């Protein structure tokens, strides 16, 4: 997703770099208590409709930056600058959620065809002061004002809010073989590849700008880093910036170790401890028969480990190949929970071909709760990065299915049509990991005929959920102005069709947005 210029989020990139980001989505409409059973959800922009960063080729083609108009003071080691980001996004949706609302909540007056406009502005100011021995005292203050004009996909009308985004002070050493970086206050933090810790802020609903999702910073953050040329050790305490209407009062702490080679290959391990949470979990009914059970405060006490790695080659026999891998394991003895999730990805860039096409295959799997065991196996995706090339599973479907009880095969073909124009085609085959187990939060609990009579079930009776296609176009006008447009469709699979009386329609949509970024 598009981010502001440095000082940026603390993203675990090249050690020694100077420091400068989940969707709370539910199958609308549904029982509010069940909708909250995600345990907090993910709060980024949705995987389609949000602004995209330019590709490296596009960025290289942009005109030189020239005079830095954002720096307004630079004297005696003190440098101060302003930041500004803004965007407008026009969205159209047809047959939202495959028209499920007309079947399971016919009295809710939910419109499955919507058009809306959304926008945001994100101004900020930052400084850094170079002191003796190379130490740098730095800080940043920014805010987000967001709004939706009309009714969005989750039936929220004219939502708007102005909130603090970042507001931190920090101290960094830079002249030693091993350096320290300490900061306190709201700011962005992404660990690993963004599988569990990436987006600390929630947009949409009463705050507006559902698709853009401009909020990324954690509401409270204390972050310390020790790094040398290749290795980085991070310790953190964070609280997400949650919606007032769905505040799980989450607090997390942990560590991250990352080792990176000169070739930018890396491997790392993140540990997460949920110190406090009111966010509930959901458990499948025994043998999948009956309504799911809510576990109040289920996330409280969760332990999670995330191993991640990435390798790419620019020369030799394996040049132009990319391989990444992520594996997460979660446990919570208090509620007898044990879950896992992971991703394997391989890609190749045809560097000598016209348009330099790159083809990437991704396999993802996130455990679902097995209704035949007493243990809770439902994976908690926490605060993942929800952009198309990160952890969104599908395009349309990711507005319904968060990364739990899912498995998916994904293909992406990206082409650099001109130095300023990029085109990406994405396809996703999405299936349920466990049958008779909640796919999302428990909506569509329904009676079905069984040999023993009618029983209630949640989830699906067939694995295949949907096939998603998404075509995205990105144009860079200059280093500050970007345009993104896309069209997408989700074709219901056997699992969705079996839960829908009659013929389930194809869910389609389109968007176009413009973003200004300084």
Question: Where are the predicted features?
Answer:
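Sec-dependent N-terminal signal peptides
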Residues: 1-3
């Amino acid at each position: 997703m598009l981010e502001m210029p440095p000082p940026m989020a603390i993203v675990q990139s090249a050690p020694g770099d100077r420091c400068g980001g989940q969707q709370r989505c539910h199958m609308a409409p549904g029982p509010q208590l069940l909708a909250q059973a995600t345990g907090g959800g993910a709060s980024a922009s949705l995987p389609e409709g949000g602004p995209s960063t330019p590709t490296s080729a596009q960025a290289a083609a942009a005109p030189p930056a020239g005079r830095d108009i954002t720096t307004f003071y630079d004297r005696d080691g003190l440098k101060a600058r302003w930041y500004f980001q803004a965007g407008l996004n026009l969205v159209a949706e047809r047959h939202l959620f495959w028209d499920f609302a007309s079947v399971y909540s016919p009295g809710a007056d939910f419109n499955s065809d919507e058009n809306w406009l959304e926008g945001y502005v994100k101004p900020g100011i930052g400084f850094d002061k170079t002191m003796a021995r190379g130490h740098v005292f730095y800080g940043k203050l920014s805010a987000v004002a967001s709004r939706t004009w009309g009714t969005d996909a989750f039936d929220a009308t004219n939502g708007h809010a102005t909130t603090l985004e970042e507001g931190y002070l920090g101290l960094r050493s830079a002249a030693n073989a091993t350096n320290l970086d300490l900061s306190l206050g709201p700011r962005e933090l992404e660990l690993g590849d963004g599988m569990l810790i990436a987006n600390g802020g929630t947009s949409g609903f009463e705050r507006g700008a559902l698709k853009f999702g401009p909020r990324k910073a954690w509401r409270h953050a204390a972050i310390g880093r020790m790094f040398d040329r290749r290795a980085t050790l991070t310790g953190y305490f964070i609280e997400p910036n949650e919606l007032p209407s769905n505040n799980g009062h989450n607090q997390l702490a942990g560590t991250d170790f990352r080792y990176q080679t000169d070739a930018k290959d890396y491997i790392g391990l993140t540990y997460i401890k949920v110190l406090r949470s009111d966010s509930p979990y959901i458990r499948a009914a025994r043998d999948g028969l009956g309504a799911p059970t809510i576990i109040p405060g289920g996330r409280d006490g969760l332990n999670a480990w995330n191993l991640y790695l990435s390798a790419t080659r620019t020369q030799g026999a394996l040049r132009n190949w990319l391989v990444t891998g992520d594996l997460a394991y979660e446990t919570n003895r208090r509620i007898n929970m044990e879950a896992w999730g992971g991703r394997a990805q391989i890609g190749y860039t045809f560097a000598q071909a016209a348009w330099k096409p790159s083809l990437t295959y991704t396999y993802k799997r996130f455990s679902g709760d097995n209704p035949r065991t007493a243990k809770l196996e439902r994976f908690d995706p926490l605060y993942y990065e929800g952009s198309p090339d990160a952890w969104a599973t599908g395009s349309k479907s990711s507005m319904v299915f968060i990364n739990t009880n899912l498995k998916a095969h994904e293909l992406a073909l990206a082409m650099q049509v001109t130095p300023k124009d990029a085109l990406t085609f994405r396809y996703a085959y999405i299936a349920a990991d466990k049958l008779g187990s909640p796919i999302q939060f428990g909506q569509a609990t329904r009676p079905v005929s069984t040999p023993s009579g009618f029983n209630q079930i949640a989830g699906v009776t067939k694995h295949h959920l949907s096939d998603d296609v998404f075509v995205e176009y990105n144009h860079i006008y200059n280093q500050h102005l970007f345009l993104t447009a896309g069209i997408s469709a989700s074709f219901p699979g056997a699992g969705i069709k079996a839960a829908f009386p009659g013929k389930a329609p194809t869910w389609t949509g389109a968007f176009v947005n413009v973003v200004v970024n300084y």
